[in-house]
């Protein structure tokens, strides 16, 4: 019989998922706040995808304590192989004999997390908003699920999941709550919470949170969950837009398949803007700006319900298939709700983020390519706005190339063809070429496209012609500031009276681009006249502080350090530390040392690299 060869596409896993596929996971965990660990067991239902040729099952682990392994109910021989940085330690489970193609084995692993777990953050009551109870939450993307339990930690494998979680505090997970069974009292003052995820998902979408959490409706199929003292303001921020966003994207792709779309507003140390955990988006409290200006994050995470969660990149080398598509769909939602000019306005903000990332890495750096080479590398190190914005610009280019009307027909086709599957960039290319093969005009344009340059060239792509109608007014205002002291311009509060928060963001980004930074006294004047230093909108405040740091305005040094102790979102934290260390490195280091235990482990590691260079994990 011929040997079965299933080449693995993901270089960032140690698992032999080319021999076995995890099709269902049962996760039974007890949340132990006093010990800061999860204790329990996971059961993998694994399907053989060879003809009895594999007698080992290899799973990813990282800093987990495995205490027992059973295969089909019987004790098994197993070992932890030597660690392979940065991928952890492979768990090798021996089988008595190979298993025929498509036959199933059940692997039951008893496991505890350890203090080196990179996926979980444990907060003391003091780190929460009402300071009453401890809190824990997970962040598994990209390769951190393996630090909670042994798994095939690759986006190229999808499983359904049953969660059985006991905790003394309410629990949220990336599944639908079994309402009649959940909250059932257990011994020792704990309750059992059960969730089912019936749509197969990759390991990085496994999510748990537990703490003092209350819920309020923000739409007919949506709730917001957060600390009781913040519930009303979070509800107000999100209730106007959430259902409108869902209705808009359902018209662009197809109906939402996950049942509920809910949002968990996390404590401020959450390292990302949002994480698209299915059913419950995990989001930063920095979007609660009391002006509904930052709910674009919700449009983005909602769009992931199609791109990323249903149709998934096969490896992190093709991350643009998750994020580029999601930014594209997010901006289509914004266009449907606010008008086409707003889509272009958002894309202009995105182009600035893309330029910043390319400048940060260097214009010929590997990580500025659309398809990256991550063999032997940590996907977290490659994380930036490049897959988001270069990916968006590629899809926007394709839309303009074939025409929006035609591209609109391709969107549901693509998301139907790969629904429940993972794919790479080459399958994407083959799919769009095949879809348009009967359209001579579109087919010619797509075949003549320089795909290799888009896929592999580092640096910036060609800049599209954006509609600048919403940015021209702020470009003009920035030019007036640049003209001081040569001009007679006198700043007034009325300069920004009619601007949205996002327009003020673009204004400040323009000021950051000045070849000659503002004089310190002008930076200070800007903050005073426009009230920027006191803005409740962190998108605005953090950029104003960066303007001040660039100017060497000492009046922003302490407010910057103060903000760095209140928010853990890397979008703000990393640039602020980079700017602060240029003008006052001792303050930057002192601020980091003071707050490093407040930050999520992922954020802490990235800031350490920014401030001190490479450090061994």
Curated annotation (Swiss-Prot):
Q: How is the cofactor bound?
A: Binds 1 zinc ion per subunit.
Query: Which annotated residues bind Zn(2+)?
Result: 300, 304, 323
The protein's matches in Gene3D superfamilies, at most eight in alphabetical order, are given as: 3.30.2010.30, Neutral Protease Domain 2, Peptidase M1, leukotriene A4 hydrolase/aminopeptidase C-terminal domain, tricorn interacting facor f3 domain
Q: What class of enzyme is it?
A: hydrolase
Q: Which GO terms describe its molecular function?
A: aminopeptidase activity; epoxide hydrolase activity; metallopeptidase activity; zinc ion binding
The subcellular localization recorded is:
Cytoplasm; Nucleus
Residues the record lists as binding a peptide: 139-141, 271-276
Catalytic activity field: an epoxide + H2O = an ethanediol
GO-annotated cellular components: cytosol; fungal-type vacuole lumen; multivesicular body; nucleus; NVT complex
**Which SUPFAM superfamilies is this protein grouped with?**
ARM repeat, Leukotriene A4 hydrolase N-terminal domain, Metalloproteases ('zincins'), catalytic domain
CDD domains, per this entry? M1_LTA4H
Output the Pfam families linked to this UniProt entry: Leuk-A4-hydro_C, Peptidase_M1, Peptidase_M1_N
Identify the InterPro entries for this entry: Aminopeptidase_N-like_N (IPR045357), Aminopeptidase_N-like_N_sf (IPR042097), ARM-type_fold (IPR016024), LTA4H (IPR012777), LTA4H_cat (IPR049980), M1_LTA-4_hydro/amino_C_sf (IPR038502), M1_LTA4H (IPR034015), Peptidase_M1 (IPR001930)
Cofactor(s) in the UniProt record: Zn(2+)
| Classification via NCBIfam families | leuko_A4_hydro
Function, as annotated:
Aminopeptidase that preferentially cleaves di- and tripeptides. Also has low epoxide hydrolase activity (in vitro). Can hydrolyze the epoxide leukotriene LTA(4) but it forms preferentially 5,6-dihydroxy-7,9,11,14-eicosatetraenoic acid rather than the cytokine leukotriene B(4) as the product compared to the homologous mammalian enzyme (in vitro).
The family note in this entry says:
Belongs to the peptidase M1 family.
User: What is this protein called in UniProt?
Assistant: Leucine aminopeptidase 2
